[in-house]
Amino acid sequence: MSAHMSLRPAGSRDDASPIALRDRRRISTWLFVICFMLIGQIALGGYTRLTGSGLSIMDWRPVTGIIPPLSHTEWERQFALYQTIPQYKILHDGFGLAGFQKIFWAEWTHRFWARVMSLALLAPLVWFAVTGALTRGLIARLLLYFVLGGLQGAIGWFMVASGFDQNSTAVEPVRLVLHLGCAFALYIAILWTALSVRTPRAAFIPATAAVVRTKRLVWCATILIGITITAGGFTAGTHAGFSYNTFPLMDGRLIPHGYARLSPFWLNWFENVPAVQFDHRLLATVTALAIGACLFAGLRTPQLGKPAQDALMLMGWAVLIQYALGITTLLLVVPAWAGTVHQTWAAVLLTIAIVTLHRLRGVGRV
């Protein structure tokens, strides 16, 4: 094979060599598609959890697991495995093979989509690398994302396996949050890379006091979004959303009774239903106020430029929608459709925040 057609370091662009405009558009479009697929996976994960489908497949076969049961005998084998765990005996006893197939397909689709995403990342990566469209640094980064995607699959199984315990009918909240958090972290990394490939040079924004203050506020708001998503994971993992289905008070109280009943105190943030739900409500409110502060500061600062101000406006609208979705999900006692949309829109809100930060990266840069 010729040197040009190999995956050698010399066959890729030097990191100091800019990627051609045509290649930048193709590469970034591909990565944006991966991001869209990841949002779909986050939605599928939420639906799988909310329908109680996550424990329906009791073996982990990364390669052959892509093939679903093709015979009645195989369906019976899978169902027999599921009947051995407490979730079936306590929650689904007697729902039959047809009921099992319904939850099986939800979990199978979630795993199948993960495999599709792996191929959608790896195959174009090989092509772009072979044709010399990628820099060495970008090849290394994208290969790392591929490996982390595989690790995320292993973390998913680590989470699911916790639900097979004889004293459990669901996965452990900490493992659920780990799986969710890693998905969002990988999503942020790929999104930032896609944005940077599409627009490698940041537009200069003068570093005035107002501009710097706005950028700091956006950073704070973005961090709060991440923390609130994490708190939402614990709300989901502890099923806290099925309690205190009133708003703005929690059964007539601002701070629910029993908030600090566990010892040591910090355990309440992760295991105590009243505390977990209150914290998620509080963080959501603080996040909305922080984004409001970003809007107030940013729209009064014309030096930011129209792209950044437009992104701030989108953040404002997105957080209002997300807050309304959260209240709706709570008051309706977490129907699967509402919970899925709420989790998915959290990814949309985070996306807009990352785009806003990316548009602000040129502050003070010439």
Curated annotation (Swiss-Prot):
<dbReference type="GO" id="GO:0005886">
    <property type="term" value="C:plasma membrane"/>
</dbReference>
<dbReference type="Pfam" id="PF02628">
    <property type="entry name" value="COX15-CtaA"/>
</dbReference>
<keyword id="KW-0472">Membrane</keyword>
<comment type="subunit">
    <text>Interacts with CtaB.</text>
</comment>
<feature type="transmembrane region" description="Helical">
    <location>
        <begin position="119"/>
        <end position="139"/>
    </location>
</feature>
<feature type="transmembrane region" description="Helical">
    <location>
        <begin position="142"/>
        <end position="162"/>
    </location>
</feature>
<keyword id="KW-0812">Transmembrane</keyword>
<feature type="transmembrane region" description="Helical">
    <location>
        <begin position="314"/>
        <end position="334"/>
    </location>
</feature>
<dbReference type="GO" id="GO:0046872">
    <property type="term" value="F:metal ion binding"/>
</dbReference>
<dbReference type="InterPro" id="IPR023754">
    <property type="entry name" value="HemeA_Synthase_type2"/>
</dbReference>
<keyword id="KW-0408">Iron</keyword>
<feature type="transmembrane region" description="Helical">
    <location>
        <begin position="27"/>
        <end position="47"/>
    </location>
</feature>
<comment type="function">
    <text>Catalyzes the conversion of heme O to heme A by two successive hydroxylations of the methyl group at C8. The first hydroxylation forms heme I, the second hydroxylation results in an unstable dihydroxymethyl group, which spontaneously dehydrates, resulting in the formyl group of heme A.</text>
</comment>
<feature type="transmembrane region" description="Helical">
    <location>
        <begin position="337"/>
        <end position="357"/>
    </location>
</feature>
<protein>
    <recommendedName>
        <fullName>Heme A synthase</fullName>
        <ecNumber>1.17.99.9</ecNumber>
    </recommendedName>
</protein>
<keyword id="KW-1003">Cell membrane</keyword>
<keyword id="KW-0560">Oxidoreductase</keyword>
<dbReference type="GO" id="GO:0016653">
    <property type="term" value="F:oxidoreductase activity, acting on NAD(P)H, heme protein as acceptor"/>
</dbReference>
<feature type="transmembrane region" description="Helical">
    <location>
        <begin position="217"/>
        <end position="237"/>
    </location>
</feature>
<keyword id="KW-0350">Heme biosynthesis</keyword>
<feature type="transmembrane region" description="Helical">
    <location>
        <begin position="282"/>
        <end position="302"/>
    </location>
</feature>
<feature type="binding site" description="axial binding residue">
    <location>
        <position position="280"/>
    </location>
    <ligand>
        <name>heme</name>
    </ligand>
</feature>
<dbReference type="GO" id="GO:0006784">
    <property type="term" value="P:heme A biosynthetic process"/>
</dbReference>
<dbReference type="InterPro" id="IPR003780">
    <property type="entry name" value="COX15/CtaA_fam"/>
</dbReference>
<keyword id="KW-0479">Metal-binding</keyword>
<keyword id="KW-1133">Transmembrane helix</keyword>
<comment type="similarity">
    <text>Belongs to the COX15/CtaA family. Type 2 subfamily.</text>
</comment>
<feature type="transmembrane region" description="Helical">
    <location>
        <begin position="177"/>
        <end position="197"/>
    </location>
</feature>
<comment type="pathway">
    <text>Porphyrin-containing compound metabolism; heme A biosynthesis; heme A from heme O: step 1/1.</text>
</comment>
<feature type="binding site" description="axial binding residue">
    <location>
        <position position="342"/>
    </location>
    <ligand>
        <name>heme</name>
    </ligand>
</feature>
